[in-house]
């Protein structure tokens, strides 16, 4: 018998938010707004970095990578969610579900790697400013971006195969708005310990290590800033980190909450679990362009000039 000659449903049924099905129609309105803001805001930042010479610097190249990742995550999830909420079209084929699962986890891990690269950018800019231009060359920036994507692909490539090896015969109903590895594996009528162990390994070895090194970079940044004599210089240096810190919090705080509920929240209502997952995936792509537009005057100026030229 072949490795993948096991029972799989032809399609899954997505419940959306279990227990809140009657609210799906009015929830679709805010979700449409979030989708538009995520796509529009991040596309504007991508275009601003592309056309504005003053933004051709490492910090903004990393920001454009973050915006690309946010657009990709939004496009991988929100159309399915809106189709479920607006049209009550809940079915998704087994293979499409696998692809969506891979893309969600891939771009989430890629975003974590980009946030780590951005923390390194802030570390070099503040702790070793004289070498900033020589350390973060265009080649190094491109290599860091490709490295984040390659790490995500290599680490997550086994996930679809780990699901395909499992016989799924309990149900074809996914109590979620989209397809994720933990929810799919729980439908299996076989031992899922390998999937659970690999999922925990991925969580700790990538997201956990990224967060550790981001924290370490800010410890070193804070130590360097505190050694600066001038209070004005300290505030100026720390102000350059505010946008990145907010982006890190917007990404990791919901992720830690979701991961904790996934593994330890057996008595947490299902709708709370799904709502937290939606916040984790939908909110950062909406907040990131707003954070950087509000806190970074160079971005605001570039966007203003870009729209001014379009108007003319």
UniProtKB/Swiss-Prot annotation:
GO terms for cellular component: membrane; plasma membrane. Residues 1-25, 76-99, 161-196, 259-273 are extracellular. GO terms for biological process: sensory perception of smell. Keywords: Cell membrane, Disulfide bond, G-protein coupled receptor, Glycoprotein, Membrane, Olfaction, Receptor, Sensory transduction, Transducer, Transmembrane, Transmembrane helix. It is a multi-pass membrane protein. One of its GO terms (molecular function) is olfactory receptor activity. Residues 47-54, 121-139, 218-237, 295-312 are cytoplasmic. The chain crosses the membrane at residues 26-46, 55-75, 100-120, 140-160, 197-217, 238-258, 274-294. Glycans are attached at residue 5. SUPFAM superfamilies: Family A G protein-coupled receptor-like. Disulfide bonds join 97-189. It is found in: Cell membrane. Its main location: membrane. Pfam families: 7tm_4 (PF13853). PANTHER family: OLFACTORY RECEPTOR 51I2, OLFACTORY RECEPTOR 56B1-RELATED. Belongs to the G-protein coupled receptor 1 family. Odorant receptor. This is Olfactory receptor 51I2. The gene is OR51I2.
